[in-house]
Each structure stands twice: as C-alpha cells, then as structure tokens.
Amino acid sequence: MKVKIKQIYQFEGASSLPAYSTNGSAGMDLYAAIASPMIIKPHETALVPAGIAISLPYGYEAQIRSRSGLASKFGVIVLNSPGTIDSDYRGELKIIMINLGQKDFQLTPAMRIAQMVIAKYEVVSWELVDDLDETERGKNGFGSSGLK
C-alpha cells in the first residue's frame, strides 16, 4: 500500500521518513525532528515532533507505540500508547513521551523515538438491544481468567 507523506523537517545527512528496521518489522521507526538535544526530566512529558505529515486512506489508522529499547533501558515511553493518527488528520505527527525513569533522558536530533504501525479498522454502527449474548465468561473481568 502506498501512503502519501509530507516531509516537514529534513535532517542534515539523514532521512526523516519512517523506516522498517528489518524485513519482519511491523512498526516503522519515527525520528525526533529536533534541531538540538532536548532533555526529558524524570516524570515529565515532552511533545516531540516527528517531522512528517501523512495522508492515510479511509479505513486505516496509524498507531504510535513505544520502542521497547527506550522503555526497558531508560523508562521512556509513548504516554498514550498506542496513540491514534486518524485517516483525516493532516498535521505534523507529534509524539507525547514521558520519562518514567529516575534520570534525565536526552533526546538527540534524528533519534529513533517511537514506532508507527498502520492498521485497518472497521467503522461500526450500533444495534441497541435489551440483552447481550450469553458467554462462559459473562461479566467477569479484571483478572478473572487467572494468571496461569
């Protein structure tokens, strides 16, 4: 599938376009479109520009997710993961990041900061009913299926 993309920020000597790291990657890396290093202090958030805008076809969304390395090594994650980019949004993608670690985290220009997964979705219509179908699980939730 081809998706239209507008490059808003051009890195010196590097591309800001999302890229798959391996042939089997589901997510494309997104890069920090910043001109100079940026510090995210412990327990603080930052809105980090990705330097691109996209035009997704109707019926698709882009999901913005944390990178496992940043999460496991530094405690830095995408706050509203997965963040949804709707098919009718045309502005620059920006990533809400939070530092859950104990130390300052330094973002550098062109650093890989998040992943973007393109996903198909269905538009639903609601059918109002008095009762729902019975299931074995019923209304049990919040750990009711056990840990093992």
Curated annotation (Swiss-Prot):
Q: Catalytic activity, per the record? A: dUTP + H2O = dUMP + diphosphate + H(+)
As cofactor, the record names: Mg(2+)
Q: Where does substrate bind?
A: 67-69, 80, 84-86, 94
Annotated gene = dut
For molecular function, the Gene Ontology terms on record are: dUTP diphosphatase activity; magnesium ion binding
Question: Pathway it belongs to?
Answer: Pyrimidine metabolism; dUMP biosynthesis; dUMP from dCTP (dUTP route): step 2/2
* Signal peptide per UniProt: none
Q: Which CDD domains match?
A: trimeric_dUTPase
EC numbers for this chain? 3.6.1.23
Pfam annotation, one family:
dUTPase
Which keywords fit this entry according to its UniProt record?
Answer: Hydrolase, Magnesium, Metal-binding, Nucleotide metabolism
Lineage runs: Bacteria, Pseudomonadati, Pseudomonadota, Alphaproteobacteria, Rickettsiales
Role of this protein = This enzyme is involved in nucleotide metabolism: it produces dUMP, the immediate precursor of thymidine nucleotides and it decreases the intracellular concentration of dUTP so that uracil cannot be incorporated into DNA.
What protein name is recorded for this chain? Deoxyuridine 5'-triphosphate nucleotidohydrolase
Write down the species.
Orientia tsutsugamushi (strain Boryong)
Q: Which family does it belong to?
A: Belongs to the dUTPase family.
**GO annotations under biological process?**
dUMP biosynthetic process; dUTP catabolic process
Check the record and name the NCBIfam families matching this protein.
dut (TIGR00576), PRK00601.1 (NF001862)
| Domain of life of the organism encoding this protein | Bacteria
